[in-house]
Amino acid sequence: MLVPMVIEQTSRGERAYDIYSRLLRDNIIFLGTPIDDNVANLIIAQMLFLEAEDPEKDISLYINSPGGSITAGMAIYDTMQFIRPDVATICIGQCASMGATLLASGAPGKRYALPTSRILIHQPLMSGLSGQATDIDIHAREILRMREITNQLLAKHCNQRLEKVEKDVERDFIMNAQQAKEYGLVDDIIYKHK
């Protein structure tokens, strides 16, 4: 992946940053990939760094992600809830699956979607399991436990009844920005950067 560089003039000459480091200086974290352990570790490290720099300054987490690993996403979720700064979440493009859970878990009143955003919630996917029947049973029970946790989180952050969320995630439930606002996944739709 090609990462753009940004050149800035300083009193000591020119300084080159990769675009993500430059955004980090403005308390912006960009999640633009599927969520796996490596991506989660990078996002978490950035959040912890920004908290250490200024625990009172909001962090903006821009999300354009198809989702991914539940455990990696939950590590990001727990960090968002743990750190002192509010984490504002902004959906650009799409927030699907765990990406939608992270979008909904931003600070109350600071969860946004751009007008043409696509938000998808569904139950966790299970693929590629093989092995002994008892091992498959263990993994199946774990995926059901993770489904229960993510459903509870969506119900809490969207201010929905758990039964409604459980019904809605049985199949892919796709929303546009306005529908996501009505559902409680986001607080507002933003058209222009303020």
UniProtKB/Swiss-Prot annotation:
It is found in: Cytoplasm. The keyword Aminoacyl-tRNA synthetase does not apply. Its EC number is 3.4.21.92. One of its GO terms (biological process) is protein quality control for misfolded or incompletely synthesized proteins. It catalyses: Hydrolysis of proteins to small peptides in the presence of ATP and magnesium. alpha-casein is the usual test substrate. In the absence of ATP, only oligopeptides shorter than five residues are hydrolyzed (such as succinyl-Leu-Tyr-|-NHMec, and Leu-Tyr-Leu-|-Tyr-Trp, in which cleavage of the -Tyr-|-Leu- and -Tyr-|-Trp bonds also occurs). One of its GO terms (molecular function) is ATPase binding. Keywords: Cytoplasm, Hydrolase, Protease, Serine protease. InterPro entries: ClpP, ClpP/crotonase-like_dom_sf, ClpP/TepA, ClpP_His_AS. It comes from the Bacteria. Its main location: cytoplasm. One of its GO terms (cellular component) is cytoplasm. The active site is at residues 97, 122. Cleaves peptides in various proteins in a process that requires ATP hydrolysis. Has a chymotrypsin-like activity. Plays a major role in the degradation of misfolded proteins. HAMAP family: ClpP. Belongs to the peptidase S14 family. PANTHER family: ATP-DEPENDENT CLP PROTEASE PROTEOLYTIC SUBUNIT. Fourteen ClpP subunits assemble into 2 heptameric rings which stack back to back to give a disk-like structure with a central cavity, resembling the structure of eukaryotic proteasomes. This is ATP-dependent Clp protease proteolytic subunit. The gene is clpP.
